[in-house]
Each structure stands twice: as C-alpha cells, then as structure tokens.
C-alpha cells in the first residue's frame, strides 16, 4: 500500500506506476475518469430465498456518450467487517440513463441499519481486470486463466487511479 502526501489527483490525467524488481521492469498506467455524482441510495424491501432485508439501489445518472465503469462497496456502519464484497459495473447497457440496477451482496441490510455506500469511478482496463477476475473465479468459466492485467511484462494485479465518493443512510 503506497501513499503520498501533498498530492492532488487530476481528473483526466493518466498516472503511471513503474516498478523495477530483480532486474525486471513492470509498468502500469491508469486515467482518473470524471466523477459521476452519487445522488443517493434507495432501499427495496425483499424476501429472497428465505432471507429478508433490503436490496440497495445506488442512484446516479450515467453521462451519455462517455464510457464509464464503476466499483461499489456497501457496509453496515455498525459493523464495518460485515460488508457486501465488491460489485462492479459499466454503462454498456445503461449509457446516459439513471441507474435502476439493484446490487446484491453478501449482506442484506434491515430496517434501522446504518449503511455506508462507496462508489469508485474506474477506467476501462481496471474494469476489464475485475470482469476477467470474476469470470475466472465464479465457477462458471471454462479452464482457469489469469485475469487480464493492466501491468506490462505479464505481471498480475492492477494499478488504478480512480475517483471516490461515499454516501451513508439509515434503512427505513
């Protein structure tokens, strides 16, 4: 985990990370996409396969004509170790539309729970990494393969420059 001080990230700028290890050079780059404002979250009461709670729907308006990709996390604010895992999406099927897609996770918030929702804007190569990682670990793929990385020299993993926003709400 690398951190810098007095560093201001700029939307639209491409950042490059270079690592030299044991005589080999690994390079990755990522561009910070424009922020798509998170307008809030809706809760839809649900009883699904015997589990009752609420499904979370993040509200945001995807800009038309611009390729956007996202990663979402949500947590029970009273127990931050109880989280949904991550959910990733892009605008291939909802370009320019208000998000209506509910997100299902490992946890279903109940009435009275305090929820923290995080939304990250990521560039396309990072989305491709998440997508290929999910395809290879879901149990529904063919032969196992490494996820598509945005690193050179066949390195695994990803480097990301991203925007971030957070929203908290009490489940009604």
Question: Could you tell me what each predicted segment is?
Answer:
Residues 1-172:
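A sequence/structural signal for flexible, mid-protein segments enriched
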């Amino acid at each position: 985990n690398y951190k810098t001080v007095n560093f201001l990230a700029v939307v639209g700028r491409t950042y490059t990370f270079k690592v030299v290890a044991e005589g080999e050079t690994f390079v990755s780059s990522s561009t910070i996409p424009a922020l798509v404002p998170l307008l809030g979250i809706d809760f839809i009461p649900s009883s699904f396969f015997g589990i009752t709670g609420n499904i979370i729907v993040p509200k945001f308006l995807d800009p038309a004509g611009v390729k956007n990709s996202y990663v979402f996390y949500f947590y029970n604010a009273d127990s931050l170790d109880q989280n949904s895992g991550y959910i990733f999406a892009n605008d291939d099927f909802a370009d320019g539309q208000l998000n209506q897609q509910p997100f299902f996770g490992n946890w279903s918030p109940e009435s009275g729970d305090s929820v923290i929702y995080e939304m990250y804007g990521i560039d396309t190569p990072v989305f491709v990494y998440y997508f290929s990682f999910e395809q290879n670990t879901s149990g529904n793929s063919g032969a196992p393969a490494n996820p598509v990385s945005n690193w050179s020299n066949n390195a695994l993993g990803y480097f990301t420059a991203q925007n971030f926003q957070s929203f908290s709400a009490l489940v009604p």
